[in-house]
UniProtKB/Swiss-Prot annotation:
Function, as annotated: Binds the lower part of the 30S subunit head. Binds mRNA in the 70S ribosome, positioning it for translation.
UniProt cross-references to PROSITE patterns, sorted A to Z: KH_TYPE_2, RIBOSOMAL_S3
Subunit structure: Part of the 30S ribosomal subunit. Forms a tight complex with proteins S10 and S14.
Similarity-based family: Belongs to the universal ribosomal protein uS3 family.
GO MF, one example: mRNA binding
Keyword terms: Ribonucleoprotein, Ribosomal protein, RNA-binding, rRNA-binding
Signal listed as a keyword: no
Magnesium keyword on record: no
Record's protein name: Small ribosomal subunit protein uS3
GO BP terms in the entry: translation
Superkingdom, taxonomy of origin: Bacteria
Native organism: Bacillus pumilus (strain SAFR-032)
Cellular compartments per GO CC: cytosolic small ribosomal subunit
SUPFAM superfamilies hit by this protein: Prokaryotic type KH domain (KH-domain type II), Ribosomal protein S3 C-terminal domain
Length: 218
């Protein structure tokens, strides 16, 4: 089962948290579509800023957005001009008060989303899919990963028949729920059509913290 299911979704509530943190009753569908709009808008506007994920929290008529990026300077802009323009654009998009936090990703080579997008950009620049995957794997392992697996699917090298090729190094224990596995996908637009990129990165085990419960009657 661990081989088929999304590794991030499988671990939510175990060692990972939700990326949208809010509760809603009858407004659930509206909030959900608003979240999708916000994420799509940010990914298009900050396509060159190495954005890994966007967390959204809601309280009354306020939306708190946390952007995880490897290039915070590009998101913030000179004197905060870019982030202020982004906040105003999101205000008008949602009709609510938007507050934006920027969190820097210290080690981009251990972030599956950024690694997948990096491979996709290399494929668009006509770099061999084998070379792109092998170089990326070496960089990620040097950065401290315990294992990585990458897969590229589509008309590889312009072949008539689409296929998938994957490379891996180290271990990627998909069944182990306490294993911190980051997973992401990306797409590369080439002259022969789209290529799909998938990346799994094993960053070590997350041991659950024991809660100290007072024993009754003692």
């Amino acid at each position: 089962m661990g081989q088929k299911v999304n590794p991030v979704g499988l671990r939510i509530g175990v060692i990972r948290d939700w990326e949208s943190k809010w509760f809603a009753g009858k407004d659930y569908a509206d909030f959900l579509h608003e979240d999708l709009k916000i994420r799509e808008f940010i990914s298009k506007r900050l396509s060159d800023a190495s954005v890994s994920k966007v967390e959204i929290e809601r309280a009354a008529n306020r939306v708190n957005i946390t952007i995880h990026t490897a290039k915070p300077g590009m998101v913030i802009g000179k004197g905060g001009s870019e982030v202020e323009a982004l906040r105003k654009a999101l205000n008008s998009l949602t009709g609510k008060r938007v507050h934006i936090n920027i969190l820097e990703i210290k080690r981009a080579d251990l972030d599956a989303q950024l690694v997948a997008e990096n491979i996709a950009r290399q494929l668009e620049n006509r770099i061999s899919f084998r070379r792109a995957q092998k170089q990326t794997i070496q960089r990620t392992m040097r950065a401290g990963a315990q294992g990585i697996k990458t897969m590229v699917s589509g008309r590889l090298g312009g072949a008539d028949i689409a296929r998938s090729e994957y490379y891996s190094e180290g271990t990627v224990p998909l069944h182990t729920l306490r294993a911190d596995i980051d997973y992401a996908t990306a797409e590369a637009d080439t002259t022969y059509g789209k290529l799909g990129v998938k990346v799994w990165i094993y960053r070590g085990e997350v041991l659950p913290t024991k809660k100290n419960t007072a024993e009754g009657g003692k």
